[in-house]
A protein has these predicted regions:
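Solvent-exposed, polar/charged alpha-helical surfaces in well-ordered, non-transmembrane soluble domains
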Residues: 49, 53-57, 75-82, 102, ...
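N-terminal secretory signal peptides
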Residues: 1-15, 19, 23-34
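Surface-exposed patches in mature extracellular/periplasmic domains of secreted proteins
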Residues: 62-75, 88-96, 114, 138-144, ...
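A generic secondary-structure micro-motif detector
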Residues: 44-45, 70, 90, 127
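Bacterial Sec signal peptide processing site at the extreme N-terminus
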Residues: 32-55
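Disulfide-stabilized extracellular recognition modules
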Residues: 2, 6-7, 122-171
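Short, surface-exposed glycine/acidic/tryptophan-bearing loops
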Residues: 74-122
């Protein structure tokens, strides 16, 4: 009887440890899931065609040629805007080490590229005004290496006046 109790006690102890480890694992996963809350997104659009004139004027003022709208760059911009809207924050990464370079490459884009992002309750004209008054964003738009661009936005799912903007530039 004592042997049976010891064996039974050991099995119960082993069973309890397994249950404890499983519970701890589930608690950790629940914590991670809470950190990765995904917000609903609203309407989104690639709007490169509507920005051709604005970008041409910006570049002409610096003696540069116009940029052409590009569907691959627009897709990369829309992808980033959607990611930002779902996360509810501005970022150049898409999580877990997926930065701008890997996203651009994943969209079939090679060569030099740059990205401007923004979050706010403003229209396209105000967006470019903000970027032109920021040294880094201005430098990207006036980089003579770039000949193509893609512009997109996605609205925040709970606040339709809040837009997440992305401009991707490339050669």
């Amino acid at each position: 009887m004592t042997v049976a109790k010891i064996e039974n006690s050991g099995a119960r102890s082993s069973f309890n440890r397994r249950m404890l480890f499983r519970a701890a694992g589930l608690a950790a996963l629940a914590g991670l899931a809470a950190c990765a809350t995904v917000l609903p997104t609203g309407e989104g659009a690639g709007v490169s065609a509507s920005a051709v004139g604005t970008l041409a004027g910006i570049r002409a003022s610096a003696g540069l040629g116009p940029l052409l709208p590009d569907p691959q760059l627009e897709q990369a911009a829309l992808q980033q805007s959607g990611y930002m809207a779902r996360g509810g924050r501005m970022t150049h990464t898409t999580g877990w080490g997926k930065g701008f370079a890997s996203r651009v490459k994943g969209n079939g884009i090679s060569g030099a590229a740059a990205e401007n992002i923004a979050e706010g309750r403003f229209d396209q004209q105000k967006l470019f005004d903000i970027w032109m008054h920021s040294a880094g964003h201005r430098r990207n738009m006036l980089d003579p290496r770039f000949t193509r661009f893609g512009l997109a936005y996605v609205r925040h799912g709970r606040d339709s006046s809040l837009r997440y903007w992305s401009l991707v530039l490339g050669r």
